[in-house]
A protein has these predicted regions:
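Nucleotide-state-sensitive switch-loop elements of NTP-binding domains
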Residues: 85-102
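Basic, amphipathic N-terminal segments that precede the first structured/catalytic domain
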Residues: 30, 43, 86-88
Length: 201
């Protein structure tokens, strides 16, 4: 079976709406249209972080800002290369990655980050920019903090209106808030525990 990040065309031939022309789109049709939201679900050591990073790589060039929320981003070497790429991109855009943090261990800064994104999108609309700025949020290893998180649920349900995409992971399907589960654009499933299954919609 071909991994989703190696597929160049969406198997269902999904076409974006005219309004989605506001956002730059990735080259791979499988990840169109952005903004998007994808959950990566598998048991521990099931490859969730690896798959999330592969998808991030395919979306990287169309995102103006990438923010990481992870309890393990300092310890897990899998994040090091991405954090360096983000810092380099910020420097290229005249931003200081030391002053403008992009990696966090809790969702405390999420409201501020979303507020800033709304302001950037509105400024782009006021200028008449061809493409509006996009934000990619990575929520990894945050099990327990995604349940009942209304702010994160709003990203899934309304984030597309202000250019916010979300990639999140969980060891179980039910580790993700029910409102998020109902509205995610897609799932990437690895090996699940015997007691776990996809909920009926």
């Amino acid at each position: 079976m071909t991994p989703i990040w190696q597929m160049s065309k969406h198997p269902l031939e999904v076409k974006g709406a005219a309004s989605e022309k506001r956002w730059a789109q990735p080259r791979d049709e499988i990840f169109q249209p952005t903004p998007t939201s994808i959950a990566f679900i598998a048991i521990t050591t099931g490859g969730k972080t690896s798959q999330m990073l592969h998808v991030t790589d395919r979306l990287f060039n169309v995102m103006d800002r990438i923010v990481i929320f992870s309890h393990s981003h300092r310890l897990d070497p899998a994040w090091h290369d991405l954090k360096k790429r983000i810092a380099d991109k910020m420097l290229k855009n005249g931003e200081n990655p030391d002053a403008q943090k992009f990696a966090f261990e809790s969702f405390k800064e999420l409201p501020r980050i979303l507020s800033e994104q709304r302001e950037r999108v509105q400024a782009g609309k006021d200028r008449g920019d061809k493409h509006l700025p996009q934000l990619l949020i990575l929520a990894a290893d945050m099990l327990g903090e995604m349940q009942g998180n209304k702010m994160l649920s709003s990203v899934v349900t309304r984030g597309r209106h202000y250019g916010v995409s979300l990639l999140c992971d969980s060891q179980t399907v039910r580790g993700i808030d029910s409102q998020m589960r109902k509205n995610l654009a897609g799932y990437c499933l690895g090996r699940l525990s015997a007691a776990d299954s996809l909920p009926r919609q």
